[in-house]
Amino acid sequence: MCIRDRADPLILIFLSSALFLGWSLGANDAANVFGTAVGSRMVSFTKAAFICGIFVILGAVVSGAGAAQTLGKLGSINAIGGSFMAALAAGLTVYWMTRLGLPVSTTQAIIGSIMGWNFFSDSYTDLSSLFKILSPWILCPVLSAVIASVIFALARKFLRVIRIGLIRLDGYTRLALILSGAFGAYSLGANNIANVMGVFVPVSPFQAMRLTDDLLISSAQLLFLIGGLAIAIGVFTYSKRVMMTVGSELMRLTPLA
């Protein structure tokens, strides 16, 4: 990993706020992916954390650039100090919610931090980008509810028709939970790494790395790799409480549900 010669060593210290935000995100948002599986005792926490950590990192590095571009249009934080404060404010908010065992959107936290920076620095806020970010907050829960209802109805009807034995059904259910959790973890990394490292992309201290003639890792991807590792550590060290809240305390769920 190459650091730019012109980079101030303080930049690496400022990045600590993004690492803290990444850790907080992993501690809180992993419940969205594996909370139901762990809460229903179908997948152990250790296995869920390992799978989630691996696929979060992959999603962040491979597919994280698109979300970062959208977030960057909301408001340009072109000062490293501003990036540090925005990430720190979001990280503290998410950590506080996690301490209470409450699931919280990291996207909402970082958007609020960026808006606060724009207000403090008298910077322009792109309202079209803000609307683009806010609209899924309304559409996503509704769409998820509809899709979940359809999938649950189809799965229940399918199981009645094929009449699988309980032991085989248990095995298939565990496998389905693991596969869906891995996909969810990949999406979590791809969509949320912008919340962790997006404000630091314009001031990245890293140079692009060429591993082979055909494989180049960009400066942003190096940031996303570090952020993905921070998220994975948060999953391993502090996510179990929120997982149990989502998986068993909010509503008692069957393994199929």
Spans of model-derived segments:
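Short, small-residue-biased leader/transition segments that mark boundaries at the very start
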Residues: 1-3
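Interfacial loop-to-helix junctions that mark the boundaries of transmembrane helices
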Residues: 5-9, 73-82, 130-139, 167-168, ...
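Alpha-helical transmembrane segments in multi-pass membrane proteins
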Residues: 14-24, 48-60, 64, 85-93, ...
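Short, non-helical or kinked segments that cap or interrupt transmembrane helices
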Residues: 27-34, 42, 100-112, 190-201, ...
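C-terminal ends of transmembrane helices
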Residues: 31-38, 90-102, 155-162, 235-250
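Membrane-interface alpha-helices at helix entry/exit sites of multi-pass transporters
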Residues: 41-53, 84, 128-130, 209-218, ...
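Core mid-bundle transmembrane helix pairs that form the ion/substrate translocation pathway
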Residues: 134-191
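Transmembrane helical segments that form the transport core of multi-pass membrane transport proteins
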Residues: 183-257
